[in-house]
Regions:
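Non-catalytic signal-transmission and effector/linker regions of two-component phosphorelay proteins
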Residues: 1-3
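Two-component/phosphorelay signaling modules centered on CheY-like receiver
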Residues: 10-32
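Alpha-helical elements of the RecA-like P-loop NTPase motor core of helicases
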Residues: 15, 40, 91
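Acidic, metal-coordinating helix/loop segments flanking the phosphotransfer/catalytic sites
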Residues: 18, 31-47
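CheY-like receiver
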Residues: 27, 45-146
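Conserved small/polar residues in nucleotide/adenosyl-binding loops
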Residues: 153-158
Length: 158
């Protein structure tokens, strides 16, 4: 089951995004009002829909969407889809490893396409089989994500 976070400071937008997500997939969907609330949640989300302009005018003490994304990146590889009316931050959004950038008002067909691609990527990442190697007389399973470098030695004298 996918774990999805929706973080937008506008309640109608959060609810609208939740409805759109439910049309695309099943999963645990959590709603957040600001970046601080999202960052405080210990859940390991698979996908985060994040408004860039969070708290720009209401509460400067909380991180905006871009700062929230930077902090998420420090601890998680969750896919981030920015949902915003601000075109000028598109390149900065990709600097923090955003999966996609959707502009408000949201085109439902485009939203569905982006969600389908995101879900496919998340599922393919989760379905990677571990590498099984023989060490001595035992077989060891190593998650592919844990492999940094691999060197093969063979006993062939040829």
């Amino acid at each position: 089951m996918l774990k999805i976070a929706i973080c937008d400071d506008e309640q109608p937008i959060r609810e609208y995004l939740k409805r759109l997500v439910k049309k695309c997939t099943e999963g645990e969907i959590r709603l957040f009002v600001d970046g601080g609330e999202l960052l405080a949640d210990p859940t390991a989300f698979d996908l985060i829909l994040l408004d860039i302009s969070l708290n720009r005018e209401q509460n400067a003490a909380e991180p905006d969407g871009m700062e929230t994304a930077r902090k998420i990146r420090e601890r998680s590889d969750a896919l981030i889809i920015f949902v915003t009316a601000l075109r000028e931050y598109v390149f900065e959004g990709y600097d923090v490893g955003a999966f996609h950038y959707l502009l408000k008002p949201i085109d439902e067909q485009k939203f569905t396409e982006v969600m389908d691609r995101a879900i496919c990527q998340i599922r393919s990442k989760k379905n990677v089989e571990p590498l099984v190697i023989k060490v001595g007389g035992n077989y060891v399973r190593i998650p592919v994500d844990d492999i940094l470098y691999c060197l093969l030695y063979t006993s062939d004298a040829a």
